[in-house]
Design a protein with these regions (language model features):
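Conserved N-terminal beta1-alpha1 strand-loop-helix module at the mouth
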Residues: 1-88, 105, 153-156, 164-165, ...
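Conserved functional loop/turn residues at catalytic and ligand-binding sites
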Residues: 38, 62, 86, 94, ...
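Short secondary-structure boundary segments
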Residues: 46, 72, 93-95, 114-115, ...
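Catalytic cores of alpha/beta
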Residues: 75-85, 118-126, 143, 162-178
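Histidine/lysine/aspartate-rich catalytic loop segments that bind and position anionic ligands
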Residues: 89, 93-138
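Glycine-rich phosphate-binding active-site loops on the catalytic face of alpha/beta enzymes
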Residues: 89, 93-99, 133-141, 175-195
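Short, charged, surface-exposed secondary-structure boundary motifs
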Residues: 99-103, 121-126, 141-146, 166-169, ...
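CoA-thioester-processing core
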Residues: 103-104, 110, 141-151, 156-158
């Protein structure tokens, strides 16, 4: 199936769940728990073994209900592999101009990683749909609020260290979306296939 990014779905619940390094065999149960828990957007990082195959499988398993994207995209080869696999949005760790420009050309939403005001504005000027502020926990919600003062036009996606307790603070600070990895996808629980726990965890973040 050919999936596409749905802004309406994303804006209704602007949380990106970040999957990094989980084996393919866990994907069906994991995605089912995420769906039941109410989350709608999942990023599979390209430094996961077999990432392209996982993205393709995720789109086939859940692409009608979940928005599936690729993270940690570091070059054009990785971008092409992710898009061929069916990723509908792209996240980069840094302001990678060739990747951003290619995404803009192909009308694929791209969320580049940046930290300083100069990097953030540069990513936005290149055509970023959102700018991933990483690592967000270095500055916390106060940093997001400070960035929004001179850069209110830039949509920010703080990522890194955001947990259930701090999420509301980031939203109040002006975050337009939130990226969550480890605090949502606890490795020990997932490897143990504790899907009821994951469903409840996703529901807690979604609410």
């Amino acid at each position: 199936m050919k999936a596409s990014f749905c802004w309406e779905r994303f804006e209704a619940l602007p949380i990106v769940g970040i999957l990094r390094g989980f084996p393919m065999r866990l994907l069906p149960g994991l995605l089912a728990a995420v769906r039941r828990g109410g989350l709608r957007t999942v990023e599979i990082t390209m430094n996961t073994p077999g990432a392209a195959e996982q993205i393709q499988e995720a789109v086939q398993l859940a692409g009608e209900e979940l928005t599936i994207g690729a993270g940690t995209v570091q070059d054009l080869a990785g971008l092409d592999a992710a898009l061929t696999a069916g990723a509908t949005f792209i996240v980069t760790p840094v302001v990678n101009e060739p990747v951003i420009r290619r995404c803009v050309e192909r009308r694929v939403p791209v969320f580049p990683g940046a930290f300083t005001p100069t990097e953030i504005q540069r990513a936005w000027d290149l055509g970023a749909s959102l700018v991933k502020v990483f690592p967000a926990d270095v500055g916390g919600p106060a940093f997001i609020k400070a960035l929004k003062a001179p850069l209110p036009h830039v949509k920010l996606l703080p990522t890194g260290g955001v947990d259930l307790a701090s999420l509301p603070e980031y939203v109040r600070a002006g975050a337009d979306a939130i990226g969550i990895g480890g605090p949502l996808f606890d490795r020990e629980r997932i490897v143990a296939e504790d899907w009821p726990w994951l469903e409840q965890r996703c529901r807690a973040f979604a609410e």
